Amino acid sequence: MVHGLKGRHRDFWVATKSFTHRQVPPVRTHVEFRSDAFPAQPGEDEQINPGRWGKVLAEYLRSALTQRGLPGGEPFAEDWGWCIPLENEKFPLWVGCGNYEDYPDGFLCFIEPSKPVVRKLFSKIDTTRRVEQVASALESALLAHGGVRELRWWSEH
């Protein structure tokens, strides 16, 4: 018996205690896949580091995510690839994408924030529901493309 609790009250306490003090279920934040449909564009490696590309993928994802109810801004170059900012009121939210060195036709997309909770001033914001919405829309967009294969999700944490 846990602290004098019996039956379902004990079960609730144990379930609540184990969830709140242990790990939060992992959120899908990173997806890798293979495709020949998103080639490097001429001069793209001048916008980002040599050997990096993903502009065609970023433009496709921006359009596809907007169609799935996740509008955002223009993709912009980073040194690692491309960033697609998404409209979100409570915390900064974006998808990063670019080629993935493990395969000549490999790509990686990742959602930020990748943590289940972010801090804003003195409060904690649960990101899991919104990040999972982005993950579902991202998966739907990639699978709908037809040129995407070997899709595999993983979590950074």
Task: Give the predicted meaning of each segment.
Residues F91-E101:
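Broad, structure-driven detector of short, well-ordered beta-strand segments within folded domains
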Residues G72, L93-V95, R149, W153:
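Generic structural motif
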Residues T16-Y60, T66, L70:
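N-terminal low-complexity, intrinsically disordered segments
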